């Protein structure tokens, strides 16, 4: 994918007095009283917005929240305004809509360095359909476009892709730039030895990532529920562990492909098993080949943690996507937490450590080690598609550097 123009390349002359349409990702979790339970995504958007404010732009922010079907008050962006205002140090105004006369009036009133937040763009079905007329209406509000919403870059929506056709320059924000530098850079020309750790419950959702990474990595470590499909493919009994029966041949072919490519593919040698899927289940550690009937594997075992740790000690670049076990249950969180601690330790020794979105981000935050990693990706699906080597519509639409 070509290198894209970044907002950092735009100077005062390009920005002062200009109306800038910024697509951010403010899709944060809210509790039943509409309090923000995790403001990571809002904080991640701040550097780009502040840069535009400091250079005298009139800033127009657009985002989605959740998956509303039409106008749904519980998905309004209004609860985000106090936190956003606090982080930016200005009073952010919010519109009741994202297009139309009222919005145009509010845009005209934004002072230099001021910020207007549009209401949830997904209140219009035209947003997800990427309808040109809707994209044109959004674009008509501004002079130039900045996309800083990496988390939705894999979607060709009106505010992520359509708008870029009608506004020039169309550039990447700082967050988008950092995501691309790390994720594209790591996959295109990593410092070797390069290891990937892939976890999660299903092989099916990670096939593309595993196949793509097998072309690039020296070491591939597998954990999470997907390992039982690999064990069964090797003829092991897996008790009542999660298995995708229709993916057994695929698991075999991935192991063969790794061998042919000289990739060291490591599966856990032992697992923590449970007599039921629950936080208070009885548990014990057994070798991977000896899971008894009626028991299910819910985490990687202590030997696996040791051998994974040793394999990672020799690396220069590590990408991690997906937990090693059911880390939501403390009893089955040791594997995931051990990997997080190992990566934090390696970061301290100069290894590039990239947490590739999704549940692994939550896991790293749970153990309080987020700050220690080289890069934590904010995109779930977008990170996966990028690691699979797929082009992202929201990135392709931006100007080349």
From Swiss-Prot:
Family: Belongs to the phosphoglycerate kinase family.
Protein name (Swiss-Prot/TrEMBL): Phosphoglycerate kinase, cytosolic
Binding, CDP: 200, 224, 322, 327
InterPro entries: Phosphoglycerate_kinase, Phosphoglycerate_kinase_CS, Phosphoglycerate_kinase_N, Phosphoglycerate_kinase_sf
Binding site for ADP: 200, 224, 327
Assigned GO CC terms: cytosol
Annotated localization: Cytoplasm
Major localisation: cytoplasm
Cofactor section: Mg(2+)
Organism listed in the record: Nicotiana tabacum
């Amino acid at each position: 994918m070509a290198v894209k123009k970044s907002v950092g390349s735009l100077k005062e002359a390009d920005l002062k007095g200009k109306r800038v349409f910024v697509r951010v990702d403010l899709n944060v979790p809210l509790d039943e009283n509409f309090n923000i339970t995790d403001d990571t995504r809002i904080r991640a958007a701040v550097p780009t917005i502040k840069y535009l404010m400091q250079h005298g732009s009139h800033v127009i922010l657009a985002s989605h929240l959740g998956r509303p079907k039409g106008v749904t008050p519980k998905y309004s962006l209004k609860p985000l305004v106090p936190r956003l205002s606090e982080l930016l140090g200005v009073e952010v105004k919010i519109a009741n809509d994202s297009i139309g006369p009222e919005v145009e009036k509010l845009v005209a009133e934004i002072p230099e360095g001021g910020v207007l937040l549009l209401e949830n763009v997904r209140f219009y079905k035209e947003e997800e359909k990427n309808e040109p007329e809707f994209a044109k209406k959004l674009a008509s509000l501004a002079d130039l476009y900045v996309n800083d919403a990496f988390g939705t870059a894999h979607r060709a929506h009106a505010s992520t892709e359509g708008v870029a056709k009608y506004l020039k320059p169309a550039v990447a924000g700082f967050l988008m730039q950092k995501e691309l530098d790390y994720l594209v850079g790591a996959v295109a020309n990593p410092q070797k030895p390069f290891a990937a750790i892939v976890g999660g419950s299903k092989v099916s959702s990670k096939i593309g990532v595993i196949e793509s990474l097998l072309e690039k990595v020296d070491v591939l470590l597998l954990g999470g529920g997907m390992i039982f499909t690999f064990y069964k493919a090797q003829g092991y009994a897996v008790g009542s562990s999660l298995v995708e029966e229709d993916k057994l041949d695929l698991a075999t072919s991935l192991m063969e492909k790794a061998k042919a490519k000289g990739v060291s593919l490591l599966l856990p040698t032992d697992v923590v098993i449970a007599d039921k899927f629950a936080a208070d289940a009885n548990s014990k550690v057994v070798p991977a080949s000896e899971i008894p009937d009626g028991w299910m594997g819910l985490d990687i075992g202590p030997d696996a943690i040791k051998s994974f740790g040793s394999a990672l000690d020799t690396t220069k670049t590590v990408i991690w996507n997906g937990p090693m076990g059911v880390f939501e249950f403390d009893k089955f969180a040791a594997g995931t937490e051990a990997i997080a601690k190992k990566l934090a330790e390696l970061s301290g020794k100069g290894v590039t450590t990239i947490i590739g979105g999704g549940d692994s981000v939550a896991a790293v935050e749970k153990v309080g080690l987020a700050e220690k990693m080289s890069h934590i990706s904010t995109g779930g699906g977008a990170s996966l598609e990028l690691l699979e080597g797929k082009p992202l519509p929201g990135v392709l639409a931006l100007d080349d550097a």
